[in-house]
Amino acid sequence: MMLDLGERHTIRRLLKKVNRLAPEMRQMSNSQLQQQTALLREQIKAGKTLEQVLPRAYATVREADYRVLGLYPYDVQVMGAIVMNQGYIAEMKTGEGKTLTATMPLYLNGLMHRGAFLVTPNEYLAERDETQLAPVYEFLGLTVSTAFRKSTDKRKTSVTPKEKREWYGADIVYMTSSGFAFDYLFSNLAGDKEGQFFPKPFNYALVDEVDMVLLDSATSPFVVASAPRVLSTMYKLADDFVVSLVPKLDYVVKRRDKAVWLTYHGVRKAESYFRIEDLFDLKYRELYRHICLALRSHFFMKRDHDYVVRDGKVILLDETNGRLMKGIQVSSGIQQATEQKEGVDVTPLRKTAASVTFPSLFGMFNKIAGMSGTAKVDENEFINTYNMKVVTIPTNKPVIRQDLPAKIYLTTSDKLLDALKEVVKLHQMGRPVLLVAGSVENSEIISELLLNRGIPHNVLNAFNASREAAMVKDAGQEGAVTVATNMAGRGTDIKISEAVRKKGGLAVIGTEMLAERVRLQLAGRAGRQGDPGTSQFYVSLEDDFVTKAMTTRFQKYYRHKVAKKRAGKDIVQLHGPRIRFSLWMLKNRVASSEESQRTQTNKYETTLRLQRATFYDDRNRVIGQDDLQKTVDRWVNQGIEFFLDKHEHWDSVAIKRLVNHHFTYEAVDLPDNLSDREQVRVYLKRLCQQIIDQKATTLITKEQLNTFYRKCLLTALDTSWTDQVDYLNTLRSYVGSWSLAGRDSGYVYNERAYNAYQKLLKKAKMRAIDNLMLSIISLNKKNQLVVQFM
């Protein structure tokens, strides 16, 4: 957005102050420059704000960049750094030095001893940047680390919690977004303080490629799974049935809405196939659910577009950049249905023990900022969802790249043939070409076509991502041709030689219609730092992006043109403002739909985020207490009350059943005076104390008893939380039907989620009694406590 006059004035004012300090910094000795860190920390300790010390801090690290790296940040980079400290997003074009710019806000926020995190998409970039910039921070007396073992670390042992605490305890930490998400989850599942990773609250995060993290990945939760459920045999039955269906007769597919359903004929066919009377009878709902999963897998999960099969496993692809999403699965059974479709081993469907999305994770920081080359396109969503303004930073040199109008074709074959003609021409001129395919499958097809034409080339897709940096580095060589999926849109810069500059620079050729932000990312690979270059996209009405969002009118137009072509009319390229406007409208409609989906998901995630924060606070209180006796007494009293609430009248049979299910498996003789609820409560409390006292005789120290208490309470909490997360995930799947029924889905969801959380607290207390009473405890040879929960 356009900053108001005051904000623009603030940025210019701070830049002038930084520049005025430059001569003073240049005259300092190394020792004097290094002493600035202690001086700045004293000023912060005395009460100065970060903005007040920013000019001196930025001038200090700017000079340190020059002395250590030989690189002196430009004024535009200082402007970007000022924006990043304000908690905004700095849009800086490819090649404008975001890596160097980040040294300034990271140094400034690292002065507080509270941690400054630089979050990148992958370990290669995090390690590269930390290795390059660590000497600057260390020169100035700050500690720096990566939140993972570097590639140079050859140790085979697993990472310990102590190592992770040391990593996250540094002043400045370079990390990956996914690694950080999983560390957060595992840290909050730890059984004691020693198992937790984060020594201090989250303070400042600077997110590289912020649009990819906070938008593209916003709806994909990171999940730690619990024990698997029993594997259903219905996946194979449903898959075999779906394969037998006849299009249009048995099912209808609406790709625009990502909807597929059985027709009346299809329902009757299912009832005949499975020999049942009514497919919609409640007793067959699991069968119907598996049929729906198989339908969705067959028609909306496309191999080498949405996923790949490698080493007998289905691995998802990130549709925005074509990278493998290892460790992430599609939820609600789609993963298992797809595995069945591909004939690989079906993984067990697991309950979710813990989950978090990026919006929830980064919402925990005191301040979050971002940088990207293409955030401006989605600035309204950043403002509405994250309250983060997007500020476009001027380039150091004017951008002279030519972005040529897209060429529009009727069919995919016509499009590819023309695109390849252009590649051959550019290759013969000696210009390097980055040829972008929309999927892994298409990149392999294009590679075959290039081989048939005798054009040597590299292929960069999910199958060889390990060579990404080397391939991208060579992509600017004279005459080089690189076929790549969207993953080539971010990361390592493509540098060109003087000879290539004279020939026109790098040419980016896209072979599919893409979302506007992805298109800008790919086009931005050419023309860095004032270099010449061109970009042009070849699109057809058969591109996935187009077919999934076509209106009925657009489909009629397409079919009409195809009929004419088959009748002999020479229709190859489509011209005119009308078709361009239609495609522009289609692209906007898709973008609006995706934004709406993210907004809706974030609305439900907000409820989970609040419950997660409350739950982890309760859990950490249990971990942090050195003496849990009072807490255990309180939980036992509450748990007994919740058990007694289940019945209004308690006779001896019901009491014995309660005791044998939750207190002891041994036979008990009940007192004769258990005539009312109060007497039953007193009896159960006394029984609990007797059992705990008996267990305590096995132990040697009070610390062991406290450890036993902690294990019992945490296990009760974690089991209850797993059920809660699983319930909320299921609850989301019902939202659509509530909306169709005219109910406020958000209100109903929040109401049911709240009620479920209250039940969680009750269940945790009752499960704690089960754990305390029915567990078996012993000491091993090292006198360490061993607890077996029955």
Per-segment meaning from a language model:
Residues 315, 324-327, 545, 549-790:
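Extended, charged helical/alpha-beta scaffold domains that provide interaction surfaces
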Residues 1-566, 587, 593, 598, ...:
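Conserved P-loop NTPase motor core
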